[in-house]
Amino acid sequence: MTEISPAARADLTPTGKLRVGINLGNFLLTAKDPATGESRGIAVDLGRELGRRLDAPVEIIGYPTPGELADAAASGAWDVGFLGAEPHRAKEIIFTAAYVEIEATYLVPPGSPLGAIADVDRPGIRIAVPERSAYELYLSRT
């Protein structure tokens, strides 16, 4: 394992602990354990592992939506956050390489005339996505 410099450790843990921001709105990445109320999932596991490597205590900070998680970056509420990289967010947040890629698709009712991407990707077709998610940010700019 690569040695973490004291400067990097100080940058990542300015409060003496690693504050990990997670998006509770994406069950593929994190969820609340119904029995304990604790957050769990890949984002939580990665945050805890980073804290272990930094030899720092970890505080998991959950946000109901990715938009709220992204907004909290400006106030310094978290040190490391797990959310989709998107050019709009990159104005305020420095992103690493992706730790996971999630494919998205369309869900339509039976008998829908929308059977192919070309049927959907045209003016006048509305697509429901979580507000201020990476999906919405992508669709808004393309």
Regions found by a protein language model. Give the residues of each.
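Active-site/binding-pocket entry motifs
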Residues: 25-28, 87, 113, 134
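N-terminal hydrophobic or amphipathic helices and topogenic motifs
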Residues: 1-59, 68
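Residues that cap or flank secondary-structure elements
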Residues: 38-39, 61, 108, 127
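Short loop->beta-strand "edge-of-pocket" segments that line small-molecule binding or catalytic clefts
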Residues: 17-23, 40, 118-136
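Alpha-helix N-cap/helix-start capping motif
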Residues: 44, 85, 132-133
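Acidic, polar ligand-binding/catalytic clefts
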Residues: 48, 52, 57-121
